[in-house]
Regions:
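C-terminal intramolecular chaperone/autoprocessing and neck/assembly modules of extracellular spikes
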Residues: 109-195, 215-229
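Glycine- and small/polar-enriched repetitive beta-structure motifs of secreted/surface proteins
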Residues: 1-126
Length: 229
């Protein structure tokens, strides 16, 4: 033990906290746990070789065999749970929940950006959650920032004519305001926004059906009138 000024530390296990100089309020339990820590404080390392390699990091919580092993010498505020979780991680403010040393854990998080990934570390900017693969849910509530298209039923709504719709489809191969297959494949869709766009088309279609029904009724009345004469 090379402690020269560190206080309120608990080191249990051969070589645990061996290099500590001035680090304080650390709890290292297990063979070689936190053995290279010198100035890092307020860390909890539980498990054989947990936190080995970290020298100055603070506020880390590691639980499991070789958690945080060979991670950044100054990595701080990391939470690693599971066998070899966070192995070789060079950053700070990270969450790893995993049972091996893979670089892409089952659950990954970044406390600095409030992001969480399942089987992925690639979380797009502006999003808090990402999943690599399919998900099954029983219910999803989507909040919309854009307006819901009830305005289609306003008397001043400029409803395109059927001929205009036909012309647009002939020229572009898709409905107006609806992304193309290529755009969806490249960028994906925002579910709430797409639901609103599809509802708009359904409401427009409803207006066309109402108009068509009125024309049919007019024709039927004309036919019936001629028949009775």
């Amino acid at each position: 033990m090379k402690n020269s000024g560190g206080n309120v530390n608990t080191f249990i296990g051969f070589n645990a906290g061996f290099e500590n100089r001035v680090g304080e309020s650390n709890t290292f339990i297990g063979f070689d746990a936190g053995s290279e820590n010198r100035s890092g404080s307020r860390n909890i390392y539980l498990g054989t070789s947990a936190g080995t390699g970290i020298v100055h990091g603070t506020k880390n919580v590691f639980l499991g065999y070789q958690t945080g092993y060979n991670a950044s010498r100054s990595g701080s505020a990391n939470v690693f749970l599971g066998y070899q979780a966070g192995y070789d991680e060079l950053g700070s403010n990270k969450l790893y929940i995993q049972n091996d040393s893979t670089a892409i854990p089952l659950i990954y998080g970044d406390f600095a950006t409030n992001q969480v990934g399942i089987d992925t570390k690639s979380i797009p900017t502006g999003y808090h959650f990402a999943v690599a693969g399919k998900i099954a849910v029983e219910e999803v509530l989507i909040g919309l920032e854009s307006s819901w298209p009830d305005y289609v039923f306003n008397v001043d709504y400029d409803l395109p004519t059927i001929r205009e719709v036909e012309t647009f489809i002939a020229q572009n191969g898709h409905l107006k305001d609806i992304p193309t297959a290529e755009e969806v494949q490249e960028h994906g869709i925002l579910q709430g926004e797409m639901d609103a766009k599809l509802l708009k088309k359904i409401e427009e279609l409803t207006l066309y059906v109402i108009e068509l029904n009125e024309r049919i009724q007019t024709l039927e009345e004309a036919v019936n009138s001629e028949t009775t004469e």
